[in-house]
Amino acid sequence: MRTNPLLGFLAALAALWLVAPATAAESEAPRLVVLGDSLSAGYGIRPEEGWVALLSRRLEKEGYGYRVVNASVSGETSGGGLARLPRVLGTHHPAVLVVELGANDGLRGLPLDELRKNLAMIVGSAQAGHAAVLLVGMRIPSNYGPEYTSGFANSFVEVSMARHTALVPFLLERVAANDANFQSDGLHPIASVQGMLLDTVWPMLKPLLHPGAAPEAARPAARR
């Protein structure tokens, strides 16, 4: 989703680090990294209200030994995420990578083969580093016609099948039908429905996790 370029740049720098300094135990914990756009960055709401922050609390409550890193940036595209990926992977070495990108590409009419190529390269690079990957899909309005709209939604399915990843077909599945679930821009969910976003992601994410994971035990073999 769109935002001020300067704010996006500053957010990109901040996104490589957690808000609070890590304890020694957290530093040893395997990382679960969310690489996303404003839908995961928590645009228009407090950081602690977003679905990624709620995920961190759920993991702690249920005994999963992961440290969540939100490397999401408002306004991000698949190309921007791909460009940032080497630093994200090099800094955090994730055991699990959640990829939530593409909405801004769709709103701008990016050619779908380019979207699929970017997503596939992100997934492949993460898998080469032995990360389990969850691809989170989106849907867009039919501004560019039904063929593009359908092809956009199917792009996530195609990449997931080709790269053998877990898939959430549509992040906003539980909230999209009700305009009251969105901020005044009609694009970004309000704070009170962020738990519904997490509940959409959780069933596909949970099988990738290891309860009480130790740093080595939490790294599944690379998927081919």
What are these model-derived regions, one by one?
Residues G8-L18:
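Bacterial N-terminal signal peptides
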Residues L54, Y64, L82-R224:
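Alpha-helical cap/lid subdomain in secreted, periplasmic
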Residues A14, T23, G42, E48-G50, ...:
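Residues at secondary-structure transition points
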Residues T23-S74, R84-H93:
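Serine-esterase "nucleophile elbow" of acetyl-processing enzymes
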Residues M1-P5:
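Positively charged n-region of N-terminal signal peptides that target proteins for export
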Residues G75-G79:
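Acidic-and-aromatic substrate-binding clefts and catalytic sites of carbohydrate-active enzymes
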